[in-house]
Amino acid sequence: ITVDKFGGEAFRAAVSEGNTKLARLLLEKGADINYHKPDMVFPNAPTAVTEAARHKNLPMVRWLIEQGADITIADKYGDRPYTVAVQNKNQELADYLKSLEPEDWHNEQEKVRQLMPYKLPAKLVEYLKTGPLRLEFPEQEWVKWAELYSYMDVQEMTRKRKKLLSLMAAMDNYSDYLLLWSPRDKKLWYL
């Protein structure tokens, strides 16, 4: 058993737990810094740098990037380090990662071109551009609020070979629910 072939899972777990010493050792021994296969702990197949961003560990994110981590790799739900920082409202980390991402990913004209095949209703586009992005449900027992992505941060994802757009950044009490736009059905989905 060699670290270069089988060390990716352990490396990602070490980074997720903030164990810099073990992460350095595994990387020195050849672990894949961009490993992103699903397993029982990480079913969405994130990279180590995405996990560091999820845990708001800016020093770890910086170190991983210095070591060659690819911040453009998205997990199975379309999350990448930048979008995780946005979800976590970690502006310092989001700004840092945005400065390193391809410029056209944050260009509105390019976003319009990218999202055109999704046939989003004009009212939804306008709402995502102007907000409010936080929806309040004070009378509901289980979900008091949900926060949508801004138009520029809407994420593309694939589920069962269908292209979808992820519209929701966070929801009260349910961290793993998704609000999705299906261009094929021209409807909102939730998972």
Task: Give the ranges of each region predicted by the language model.
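Ankyrin-repeat boundary/"N-cap" motif
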Residues: 2-13, 36-48, 74-80
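A surface-exposed partner-binding patch
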Residues: 77-182
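Conserved ankyrin/ankyrin-like repeat signature
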Residues: 21-22, 59-60, 92-93
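Ankyrin repeat domain, specifically the short helix-to-loop turn at the C-terminus of the second helix
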Residues: 1-2, 24-33, 62-70, 96-102
